[in-house]
C-alpha cells in the first residue's frame, strides 16, 4: 500500500479569501465538496498536496470550531489561515503581509484575577506559537510572488478579537497591551484549536486597512485584491511544505 499523504487544511473567513483555491481544484478536476452543518469542506489537490479548504465564517468561535472539525473529521495535519487584516505597526502598509510568529486574543482580559494582558486563565499561556517551518515556507513563497516586487512581508504577532477595529483609540489600546503587527478576527481561534490538538499552524495576512478611522475608504477598496494576493502566496507556499 502507498503511503498516506498528509492533508493540509486552509481556512479563510470569507469566500473572497478562499475562492482562488477552489477554482484551482475545479480546474485540475480534483474538487470534492462535503457539507458538515453550515460548513462546506472543499477537498482536492493543489501543488501535488492533499488539501481541505473551508470558509469558517467570521469570528473567533466560528474559526476555532471550523479548525477542530478540520482536524478531527478531515484529518488535517497542518493548518494555514489565510486572509486580510488591519495594520497596527506603523511600518506596515496596504498590501504588505504578515506571517505569524504567534497569535493572541486582544480582547482576553482576566487581569482582575492577576493574569497578564491576553493571558488565558488556567492555560498558562497568553500566546500560541506558529510553526517555524511553515513560517519559512511562507517567506520563501512570498519572495517568489508578484507581491514581493512592490510590497513586503514581515514576521509578527497576530492579534485576534471579536471586534472590527475601526478607530484610533481602539488601535492604540491593542498596541499597548500586546504589541501585534496586525489585527483580525479569526487567527487566534484557529491557533488555539491547533495548540490543543498539537497541530502545526501558521497565519498569513495581507493588510487591507489601517485599523483606524480611514477604514471606510481603505477596507472596501482593498478587501478583494488583498485577499487574492494573500491566497496567491499561500498557493505557492504549498510547494514548500511536506
List the predicted regions and their residue ranges:
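N-terminal short beta-loop-beta anion/metal-coordinating cradle
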Residues: 2-68, 74
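Alpha-helix C-terminal capping segments
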Residues: 69-73, 91-92, 191-200
Amino acid at each position: 500500500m502507498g503511503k498516506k499523504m498528509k492533508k493540509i487544511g486552509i481556512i479563510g473567513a470569507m469566500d473572497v479569501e478562499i475562492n482562488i483555491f477552489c477554482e484551482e481544484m475545479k480546474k485540475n478536476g480534483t474538487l470534492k465538496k462535503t457539507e458538515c452543518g453550515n460548513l462546506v469542506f472543499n477537498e482536492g489537490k493543489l501543488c501535488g498536496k492533499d488539501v481541505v479548504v473551508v470558509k469558517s465564517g467570521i469570528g473567533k468561535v466560528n474559526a476555532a470550531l471550523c479548525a477542530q472539525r478540520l482536524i478531527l473529521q478531515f484529518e488535517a495535519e497542518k493548518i494555514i489561515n489565510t486572509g486580510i487584516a488591519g495594520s497596527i505597526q506603523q511600518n506596515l502598509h496596504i498590501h504588505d503581509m504578515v506571517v505569524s510568529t504567534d497569535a493572541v486574543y486582544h480582547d482576553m482580559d482576566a487581569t482582575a484575577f492577576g493574569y497578564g494582558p491576553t493571558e488565558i486563565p488556567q492555560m498558562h499561556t497568553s500566546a500560541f506559537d506558529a510553526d517555524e517551518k511553515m513560517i519559512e515556507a511562507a517567506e520563501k513563497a512570498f519572495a517568489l510572488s508578484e507581491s514581493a516586487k512592490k510590497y513586503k512581508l514581515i514576521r509578527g504577532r497576530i492579534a485576534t478579537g471579536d471586534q472590527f477595529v475601526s478607530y484610533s483609540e481602539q488601535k492604540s489600546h491593542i498596541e499597548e497591551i500586546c504589541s501585534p503587527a496586525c489585527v483580525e478576527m479569526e487567527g487566534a481561534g484557529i491557533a488555539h484549536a491547533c495548540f490543543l490538538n498539537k497541530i502545526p499552524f501558521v497565519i498569513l495576512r495581507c493588510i487591507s486597512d489601517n485599523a483606524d478611522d480611514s477604514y471606510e475608504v481603505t477596507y472596501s477598496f482593498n478587501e478583494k485584491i488583498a485577499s487574492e494576493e494573500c491566497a496567491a502566496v499561500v498557493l505557492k507556499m504549498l510547494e514548500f511544505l511536506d
